[in-house]
Regions:
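N-terminal catalytic or cofactor-binding beta/alpha core of small enzyme domains
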Residues: 1-131, 135-137, 148-149, 155-159, ...
């Protein structure tokens, strides 16, 4: 069973859920209720922030999609997807310090592809680096649209995101070349998104430059990035020039310890 979570506090989330219910007959239940066992997926409504739902492992879902608005300081409209977790000692937006959730790399790759196919609106399409809560052992991903008020409330954009989730749940398996983790780059890791869309790299977790403490003091988190994922990680991808030499050395040392090779981009 697959869970699809939406929050009544989030208009984009509501619009996506309503689309799935109206167009594809998804069953909706309230948080704490049971899904019909005959269905492949169901929608769960919550009155809480999606970032606070650390208790969802109790449902024993095989996978969880979070339908969410996207926030952008620059107001850039975008379709995005990302895993959850906190790389640092801070956990201001849910989850716990120095804890990553289990990621869903193939589903995130599939969502990016669905966005690209349906994006007739000129919105940005991107991964976001791993950030915020909730903290879960169940593999999960956020599927988002927004960046500004118009994009958040746009029902045509919600249709794109809703249809992407539907297609990933009910259509064929995602083809990919390799499952990887990403190190460096920015919160919107353009190079990683391009590798996903052009070469089929399925990113599990992404550690952006700004979340690296000091000159690599928290590279121990790479072990979680490799182990906490639905699919086995084969290699790391490092945005070489975004890291200084001391940080690169610590990253490579940790990757060697984990027995993981790397590519420079």
């Amino acid at each position: 069973m697959i869970g699809v979570l939406y929050s009544i506090l989030d208009i984009a989330s509501v619009n996506m859920a309503e689309y799935l219910e109206r167009e594809h007959g998804f069953e909706e239940i309230d948080e704490g209720s049971a899904c019909a066992s005959s269905r492949k997926a169901c929608i769960i409504k919550t009155s809480k922030s999606l970032l606070e739902l650390d208790e969802l492992d109790k449902y024993n879902f095989e996978l969880i999609y979070f339908l969410s608005k996207h926030s952008s300081a620059k107001g850039i409209a975008a379709f995005t997807t990302h895993p959850t977790g906190n790389w640092t000692k801070e956990a201001k937006l849910g989850g716990k310090p120095y804890e990553l959730s289990y990621s869903a790399p193939l589903e995130m790759l599939g969502i990016l592809r669905e966005f690209k196919k349906a994006n007739n609106y000129g919105l940005e399409i991107s991964y976001e680096a791993t950030h915020h809560g909730p903290l879960l052992k169940t593999p999960s991903l956020f599927v988002e649209v927004g960046g500004n008020n118009d994009a958040v409330s746009n029902k045509e954009y919600a249709k794109v995101t809703g249809e992407a989730v539907y297609n990933l749940i009910y259509n064929d398996d995602v083809e990919f070349s390799k499952v990887v983790i990403g190190i460096g780059n920015t919160h919107y890791p353009t190079k990683f998104s391009e590798l996903a869309l052009n070469k089929g790299y399925a990113f599990a977790h992404m550690l952006p430059k700004h979340a690296i403490e000091g000159n690599g003091d928290n590279v121990f988190m790479l072990e979680q990035a490799v182990k906490r994922t639905k699919n086995e990680v084969e290699i790391a991808v490092i945005d070489w020039k975004s890291l200084n030499s001391e940080t690169r050395a610590k990253v490579i040392s940790k990757l060697n310890e984990l027995g993981l090779d790397y590519e420079r981009v």
